[in-house]
């Protein structure tokens, strides 16, 4: 999750050109209260898990459709490639000319503004990348970790987990911004990094012996848990040192979203996964048919 220039904010005031100001305080417009994005995140996250739970129950209790055919399910590879395709598609849309109607639309819905929060942008921004390198790094990491977690969770649960991790990481980013900077305008955020941290954290829980290679040290395998802790320690340092360290200020990385995603992924893997599976267990055979369909003899 990276910070982005707040071009969309200036458009709210009818600006025709873009001028960068590192800190601006808006006095006449009230920022979006935090209870709105929090309520949105809880509501949408709950709805996605409820829908996934319903679909998984239906698949387990009724493995065949009413016509006798198995209920189709997309393969894990197809699901992962579909999500990557959405990210690539949004990246292609960003190639539109600056200040065009399409670019303005993306600035409004594909970038999460920390002050004037557009609720759909809390989800869409996680599929949005402006930089080719940002997209490449995130999608390589996503393709490396996601297939294993899709196989563990199943397609429906993974989609609910992925959307919820996006929302949780963005809420963490918003909370940090309001607590740290108040109503000061900072660059908006976009990118899938927060959700990828959640997937990596879940992978480290289910596959603790798995090893990864860091791009700068490709020939040195590192336990995934150690690598994840190292990255989260770096994010914690960046969170604390922003404003004091020139490097932390220069990177414009949304460290709070990374930490929020990692924490959500680990907590869900430890507690949420087992709870979800208990709720989708198939019903006993004796209860799978309505009472009036059973044969009764006297």
From Swiss-Prot:
GO terms for molecular function: serine-type endopeptidase activity. Its main location: membrane. The chain crosses the membrane at residues 32-52, 74-94, 109-129, 133-153, 157-177, 188-208, 214-234, 247-267. PANTHER family: RHOMBOID PROTEASE. Signal peptide: none annotated. GO terms for cellular component: membrane; mitochondrion. SUPFAM superfamilies: Rhomboid-like. The keyword Signal does not apply. To yeast YGR101w. It comes from Schizosaccharomyces pombe (strain 972 / ATCC 24843) (Fission yeast). This is Uncharacterized protein C13E7.11.
């Amino acid at each position: 999750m990276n910070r982005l220039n707040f071009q969309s904010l200036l458009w709210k005031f009818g600006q025709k050109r873009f001028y960068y100001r590192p800190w601006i305080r808006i006095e006449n417009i009230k920022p979006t209260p935090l209870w709105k994005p929090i309520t949105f995140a809880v509501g949408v996250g709950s709805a996605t898990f409820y829908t996934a739970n319903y679909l998984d129950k239906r698949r387990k209790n009724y493995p065949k459709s009413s016509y006798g055919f198995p209920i189709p399910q997309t393969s894990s590879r197809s699901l992962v490639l579909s999500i990557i395709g959405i990210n690539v598609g949004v990246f292609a849309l960003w190639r539109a000319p600056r200040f065009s109607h399409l670019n303005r639309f993306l600035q409004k819905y594909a970038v999460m503004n920390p002050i004037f929060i557009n609720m759909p942008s809390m989800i869409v921004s996680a599929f949005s990348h402006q930089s080719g390198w940002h997209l490449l790094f995130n999608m390589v990491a996503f393709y490396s970790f996601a297939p294993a977690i899709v196989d563990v969770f199943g397609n429906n649960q993974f989609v609910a987990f992925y959307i919820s991790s996006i929302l949780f990481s963005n809420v963490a980013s918003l909370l940090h911004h309001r607590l740290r900077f108040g109503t000061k305008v900072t660059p908006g955020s976009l990118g899938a990094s927060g959700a990828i941290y959640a997937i990596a954290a879940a992978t480290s829980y289910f596959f603790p012996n798995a090893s990864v290679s860091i791009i700068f040290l490709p020939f040195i395998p590192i336990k995934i848990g150690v690598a994840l802790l190292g990255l989260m320690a770096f994010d914690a340092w960046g969170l604390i040192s922003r404003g004091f360290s020139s490097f932390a200020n220069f990177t414009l990385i949304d460290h709070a979203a990374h930490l929020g995603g990692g924490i959500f992924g680990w907590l869900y893997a430890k507690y949420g996964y087992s709870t979800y599976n208990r709720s989708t267990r198939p019903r006993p055979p004796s209860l799978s048919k309505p009472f009036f369909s059973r044969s009764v003899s006297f």
